[in-house]
Amino acid sequence: MGASASGPECSGDEPSRPINVKVNHFFHDPTLSSYTSTENIPWEGNERMILDAWVRPPFKSLKDVLAPTPGARPSVKRSPLVSGYERPQSMVQKSVDLFLQEMDEAGVDKGILVGRQAGHRVVSNDDIAELRDQYPQRFPLSIAGINGADVPAALREVERTITKMGFNGIAVDPGWWVPAMYVDDPRIYPIYAKCQEHGVVMYLTCSLMQGPDISYAEPWRIQRVANDFPSLQIVVVHGAFPYTSEMIGVMIANAPLGNLWVLPDFFQSIPGFPGAQDWVEAANHYLGDRILYASSYPVRPLKQSLLEFQRFSYKPDVLENLLSKNAANLFRMKV
């Protein structure tokens, strides 16, 4: 298992072959970033491969990832975040075998395991590595969760997970740390610098839920980090909702650097959610090589998420990019 963003090599039954993906010329300038072209990435014979860029199967410490915050107000049925939610049996029974079965039923070929260490929400990176190693064909990529509230400890964990455990990236939730931090807080910068040094991907979670108030999702702060660390590939998880238009603007402004990606996940796939169609228009016209598909399981079920995502009117080549090829490009995968 490789320890950089180049990702692992996973053998398949069919020989790999080069593909040429249509990349919007607004972003396509190989002199600016090694991530701006998806040409000649070895790919399996299955053109319709689906890679879910954010999953947390029910395995050991991942089983409790949705545990409620102590002292938090109870969830309410009228919340759009639970609109039409179909609780998957794999989550009910806490079964990895059922999760793999649900992957097959949904047509999801591979998933990226994503950790989290924020407040009481702690997923063991050792558990993620164990699950990844048990099912390397299903989970070829892994992202380690890091708690930046203790920077020296966080830097040690970055070093351990990347250099010794073969993780492909780091996930941070600054708004959920104790104390909460904005993404451009200077205290976090050593973590960004360490990730940039190792050439791994940064999953940066920003939305109305991550932080004491929605100011913790402000896209201009994300833009500042991207500018300050131009070689750090940053995936904005949840798309900085509710600042959808502003986030799209930041993505456009980031074109010369080409180091920002976005993962709108359930904030887009929930039917009728505000701003969802904006991502479709952006993908179809100028961000088709910058958006990743993810269910964010267990927040939304695998099959339900995919069906809700596919109901949008994406151009066929754009849909293919979002469902797998953009993630392959980001991680420079050989699958």
Predicted regions: what they are:
Residues C10, H25-A53, K60-K110, R160, ...:
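Mid-to-C-terminal alpha-helical segments outside catalytic/metal-binding sites
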Residues V122-D126, A153, A180-I188:
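Active-site-adjacent beta->alpha loops and helix N-cap segments on the catalytic face
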Residues F27, M165-G169, P174-L292:
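Catalytic pocket-lining loop regions of alpha/beta-barrel enzymes
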Residues G2-V23:
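Polybasic, low-complexity intrinsically disordered segments
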Residues W54, M103, I128, S142, ...:
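Divalent metal-coordination and catalytic microenvironments
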Residues L100-E102, G107-V123, D127-L131, P136-I146:
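Short, well-structured secondary-structure segments
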Residues W54-K60, T205, H238:
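Histidine-centered divalent metal-coordination motifs
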Residues V82-Q93, L141-P152, M181-Y182:
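Active-site mouth loops of central-metabolism enzymes
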